[in-house]
Amino acid sequence: MASGILLNVKEEVTCPICLELLTEPLSLHCGHSFCQACITANHKKSMLYKEGERSCPVCRISYQPENIQPNRHVANIVEKLREVKLSPEEGQKVDHCARHGEKLLLFCQEDSKVICWLCERSQEHRGHHTFLMEEVAQEYHVKLQTALEMLRQKQQEAEKLEADIREEKASWKIQIDHDKTNVLADFEQLREILDREESNELQNLEKEEEDILKSLTKSETKMVQQTQYVRELISDLEHRLQGSMMELLQGVDGIIKRIENMTLKKPKTFHKNQRRVFRAPDLKGMLDMFRELTDVRRCWVDVTLAPNNISHVVIAEDKRQVSSRNPQIMYRTQGTLFQSLTNFIYCTGILGSQSITSGKHYWEVDVSKKSAWILGVCAGFQPDAMYNIEQNENYQPKYGYWVIGLQEGVKYSVFQDGSSHTPFAPFIVPLSVIICPDRVGVFVDYEACTVSFFNITNHGFLIYKFSQCSFSKPVFPYLNPRKCTVPMTLCSPSS
């Protein structure tokens, strides 16, 4: 009953033109009410086609624009009606139009809305393409099914993107944490260097202070004695001048001669411009070296030793460690027993299993506690040739060796090409190594044709760098423990 009354009221406040609830209702003197926009549009049409005649769209009674009045009473009814819901039963009827109460049987293609027949005739949907729901339901069902499959694919892509970004986030965190650790370690090394340099400088200054002040104290004592002696002479002369004639003349020539011949001794002094000038450590150079070492360490490769049949060396099971046997090896050739300690250096040379034909490669070798070793890169050698007695002279770049070495525990050297007078003898150049390395880093840049050696023990300082290397064929890591039985160890990248 109540819903019927509401429907009747709704009909009374519905615009006859747009068939919607009145919006800003205006009433003509004939009593009919219209939306302000609808009656204005109707007025414009009347002016265009009927030569200025204005008439009510419902009853066709003429009207004048000044007779149009806002209908606030109807506006209030419309406002209240919009707030009022129909009965619960009617509200649950989703197949009926909420505006007109008619069955929702049509589909408006332009607005993608289900509408009733009154909606179809309204201003909102006028001129639109409308269809029975049954005509388009199957078509849109297929489209929605296709869209659903597309969404499921998008969901998989989205989940993969989500997983990828999480993985990247975790990777970045690990990398940054690793970089933080490296930064802390690098600056700790810098602090160690600065502390050591500071301690050395202070010790030098204390020694300098002790030596100089000790010498100046001795000079000061002599100067005090000399001053006292002069004062005593002055006192003696003053006494003679004030005394009797006999006291004045007694031994006067000797005193005058002694004064005339007296020469003041000057103290031993130290010229300040001769002092050793203190220079702060080259922090920029240190940082540059740290950066260089950090860069090359990004090219760290996991090097292992190649298997071999050399009886004079022992390779560990993990193929990372090599050591020499007792060098007093006896060789038997054609029934003759002879000792070849010279050839032993080359007989203990071992190649890494990884060949280098391009790119950048870095590895580190632990040589702690060894008194002799040779390491670097080699362009490969024939095992049979190692027994050639002349090969102990072929550690030269032109023969495919870019190596440095240690002998007698303190003598570091680099093997360079020999002169034209001694082409088969390498030119052995001593290296200045302040801190003996327990670990040596080797960096090969194949395209740049360089081989660099770093003292990892001394904060990554560069030991030596070969430039313009002639890499005409693959090169290999090279280790030679020489006659020292202490092992050499290839370090893993994680060490």
From Swiss-Prot:
GO BP annotations, alphabetical order: activation of innate immune response; autophagy; defense response to virus; innate immune response; positive regulation of canonical NF-kappaB signal transduction; positive regulation of MAPK cascade; positive regulation of NF-kappaB transcription factor activity; protein K63-linked ubiquitination
Ranges that cross the membrane: none
InterPro entries: B30.2/SPRY, B30.2/SPRY_sf, Butyrophylin_SPRY, ConA-like_dom_sf, SPRY_dom, TRIM/RBCC, Znf-RING_euk, Znf_B-box
Catalysed transformations (reactions): S-ubiquitinyl-[E2 ubiquitin-conjugating enzyme]-L-cysteine + [acceptor protein]-L-lysine = [E2 ubiquitin-conjugating enzyme]-L-cysteine + N(6)-ubiquitinyl-[acceptor protein]-L-lysine
Subcellular location: Cytoplasm; Nucleus
PANTHER family given in the database record: E3 UBIQUITIN-PROTEIN LIGASE TRIM (PTHR24103)
Protein name listed in UniProt: Tripartite motif-containing protein 5
Organism in which the protein naturally occurs: Macaca nemestrina (Pig-tailed macaque)
